[in-house]
Each structure stands twice: as structure tokens, then as C-alpha cells.
Amino acid sequence: MKLLLLLLTVTLLLAQVTPVMKCWGKSGRCRTTCKESEVYYILCKTEAKCCVDPKYVPVKPKLTDTNTSLESTSAV
């Protein structure tokens, strides 16, 4: 009976593991080091990085040449 109680206690303690902090709209995980397949762009509240799968990171917008748009505006 004591063995059963000990087993139950250990099982309950293992089930109460601290949940992983999520970030980036719940698509990322706060870790000290990211996996090889992950990238990070922001930091979590602690000194951890927000590790995200690259498919969830938005693509950087392509910048337009501002000089050409200014020249065409001044010619009008």
C-alpha cells in the first residue's frame, strides 16, 4: 500500500511540471537556446529567446526605391 501511495505521489509531482512560456502569438517557445530548425527575432520577459519555426515568421516587405518616387512626384 505504501508503494502505491509513493507511486501516486511521484506521478502527481511529475504532472505538475512548470508549463513552458509561450510567445509570438503562441507559435513560439521561450528557451535559452533555439533548436537548429528555429529562429528568434524577439526576446521573452526573462533572458530567454522566443524560438519560432521560420514558417510562422512574416516575410520582410520589399522596400521600394524612395528616390524614384520623389523624382516622379517633383516632375508633376
From Swiss-Prot:
Tissue specificity note = Abundant expression in the male reproductive tract only.
Subcellular location as annotated: Secreted
Record keywords, A-Z: Antibiotic, Antimicrobial, Defensin, Disulfide bond, Secreted, Signal
A single Gene Ontology CC annotation of this entry is: extracellular region
Q: Which GO BP terms sit in this record? A: defense response to Gram-negative bacterium; innate immune response
Question: In this UniProt entry, which cysteines form S-S bonds?
Answer: 23-50, 30-44, 34-51
InterPro entries hit by this protein: Beta-defensin (IPR050544), Beta_defensin_dom (IPR025933)
Tell me the leader sequence span. 1-15
Chief location bin: secreted
Briefly, what is this protein's role? Has antibacterial activity.
Similarity field: Belongs to the beta-defensin family.
The entry's protein name is: Beta-defensin 121
